[in-house]
């Protein structure tokens, strides 16, 4: 499966919101309430101004968008970024998440070989736990609701 990667643009706001608000995605999100369109557009517009520092990547197969990844600089650790991955619910179960994770890690570590990636995963999201573990992320810590993984 040939997958392409590109940086998000303003044209992607609607598809990102629809993916984020899908019930299957919200179930394991850190903030499980639906996001209003106005809130999303405000956040996304501000985020696009920092896209070089904190990228959002979109992934496509045969020119159809299938998922995204986002890298957030952790302000308390300037050497760490939090990675978030989302697969279009219509494409779950096809190995797309592992391809997105791999491609994002390659892009990230090519740009930042001295930094690390951290993933916060809902304790009930066993698929994501397996995804990050299989990609070489090590369990860093646990809380009541989340597991934190890190890849150096």
Task: For each feature predicted by the language model, list its residue ranges.
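Acyl-donor (CoA/ACP) binding surface of acyl/acetyltransferases
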Residues: 1-15, 22, 60-152
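An amphipathic alpha-helix signature
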Residues: 10-17, 37, 41, 45
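Hydrophobic helix-cap positions at the C-terminus of alpha-helices
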Residues: 19, 47-50, 108
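Residue-level marker of structural boundaries
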Residues: 22-25, 34, 49, 92
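Conserved GNAT-fold acetyl-CoA-binding loop/helix
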Residues: 24-44
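Short, hydrophobic secondary-structure boundary micro-motifs
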Residues: 27-29, 56, 118
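Sparse recognition of residues in long alpha-helices and their boundaries
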Residues: 32-33, 56, 148
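A short helix-loop-beta-strand connector motif used in the catalytic cores of GNAT acetyltransferases and
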Residues: 45-58
């Amino acid at each position: 499966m040939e997958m392409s990667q590109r940086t998000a643009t303003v044209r992607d706001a609607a598809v990102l919101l629809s993916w984020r608000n899908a019930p299957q995605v919200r179930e394991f999100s850190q903030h499980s309430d639906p996001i209003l369109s106005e809130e999303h557009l405000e956040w996304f517009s501000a985020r696009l101004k920092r896209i070089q520092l904190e990228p959002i990547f979109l992934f496509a197969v045969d020119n159809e968008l299938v998922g995204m990844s986002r890298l957030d600089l952790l302000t308390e650790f300037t050497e760490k970024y939090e990675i978030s991955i989302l697969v279009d619910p219509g494409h779950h179960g096809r190995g797309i998440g592992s391809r997105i994770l791999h491609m994002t890690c390659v892009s990230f570590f090519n740009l930042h070989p001295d930094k690390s990636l951290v993933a916060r995963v809902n304790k009930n999201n066993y698929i994501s736990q397996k995804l990050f573990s299989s990609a070489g992320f090590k369990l860093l810590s646990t809380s009541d609701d989340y597991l934190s993984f890190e890849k150096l």
